[in-house]
């Protein structure tokens, strides 16, 4: 009989064998802060237009080369629970605003780094948290006073493109003017009168070859597909959409047929042919000249479609089918029945075209009032086009934010330095120990212009001292000049480097909430990981290809 070994007294004896627990400042708080600092340091070098790219290979061995913090974090699959909280805050920023994810990480990391200094000199966690929350509220009070301009007309392509430039610059520095114009054209063309803009209505089609300057905007949809039949171009298209295969109905039972004469053999499939002919003719008689199907196309059905001059397009993706229905105003039919007028879609032209060496089917609306617009991106490599697509995504999300709130604040670290200056002054007036935390909160804002300066290769301390000097004189819109070879500053409003008010508001709020949540943790209790055999490493999950 095995000897019973008693567990050590204390918290551990209440837990299952193999469970771990950490408590106190040294074991829990400082450990969590260290993990968050490491994560923030990773993405900090990717901040701003001159940020470095990260090469990430995910669990499916897919390669990502990008400086987009949201993509990096999504593919890294962070496991540490405290670092995960900051990752979740950045995901919330992406859902709420669509841009500014790296700001959340860098700012939250700076807040925690400075909180550690305060804790080590003797402040309690509750005093640091209270100071941070007071400072966050103060920052939100100050922020409306820093608004330098507002978007006047969101239906003017030139004005919109100038406002989108900054968000694209951080991903595609050098191509921002061209891309901003493309995105502005796409967004303005489908911006409804109601003012409710849906980002899913801007589609991106990536076609390998040529260069980024060959990219274009189409009002309608583009699919990397070929037509099934002989008809490759239709003007004034009336479109019937089917979610079923374009084929005759067959019984599920199997049967054996005895054929005795040559005449019986000749007439054997004639009934099936006549039925298929009648079905396709009925569709053609409704006026439909384009059929889009979500299933396979039978050879016999294809023959009759060619006979009645019907253009056939097959889309394998049900999402593409839904988007096409939305674009052309059609209803997807589950059975091969003739569509009524209300179920048919319409667009100005459907044609098979060649972009580079890729065949594409284009559903085009000549008038700029279509429900969906497509940006056709060209590029030399897939990774480059993926990165351009992320820049387009940021630009479209910025337009969406501007439809909700047209206010803009100066970029380039100008807003952060002004907030730091004013919150520091406010901290001086606070009597309690919270004033130290309030001042550290203000100091954390310096992390943003510091990251911009370091990534641009100039001395950060010189830049920050110059910014403070200019802001003390009352120039609220002056920020870092990233194009200068020496530490220099310039007016961000004149340079057109502007951030959305909502983006800044939510980034400060979410970063502070994440930092405070991490600081509130004083114990970590981890159950023993579940046992059992590990899944074989060579085989992938059946649904892994969907995540790719």
Curated annotation (Swiss-Prot):
Residues the record lists as N-acetylalanine modifications: 2
Binding site for ATP: 100-102, 170-171, 412, 499, 504
InterPro entries attached to this UniProt entry: Chap_CCT_theta (IPR012721), Chaperone_TCP-1 (IPR017998), Chaperonin_TCP-1_CS (IPR002194), Cpn60/GroEL/TCP-1 (IPR002423), GroEL-like_apical_dom_sf (IPR027409), GROEL-like_equatorial_sf (IPR027413), TCP-1-like_intermed_sf (IPR027410)
Source taxon at top rank: Eukaryota
EC number: 3.6.1.-
Keywords linked to the UniProt accession: Acetylation, ATP-binding, Cell projection, Chaperone, Cilium, Cytoplasm, Cytoskeleton, Hydrolase, Isopeptide bond, Magnesium, Metal-binding, Nucleotide-binding, Phosphoprotein, Ubl conjugation
Amino acids binding ADP: 47-48, 100-103, 169-171, 412, 499
CDD domains: TCP1_theta
Region feature Disordered, mapped onto this chain: 529-548
Membership in a protein family: Belongs to the TCP-1 chaperonin family.
Function: Component of the chaperonin-containing T-complex (TRiC), a molecular chaperone complex that assists the folding of actin, tubulin and other proteins upon ATP hydrolysis. The TRiC complex mediates the folding of WRAP53/TCAB1, thereby regulating telomere maintenance. As part of the TRiC complex may play a role in the assembly of BBSome, a complex involved in ciliogenesis regulating transports vesicles to the cilia.
PANTHER family per record: CHAPERONIN (PTHR11353)
Name by which UniProt lists this protein: T-complex protein 1 subunit theta
Protein's organism: Macaca fascicularis
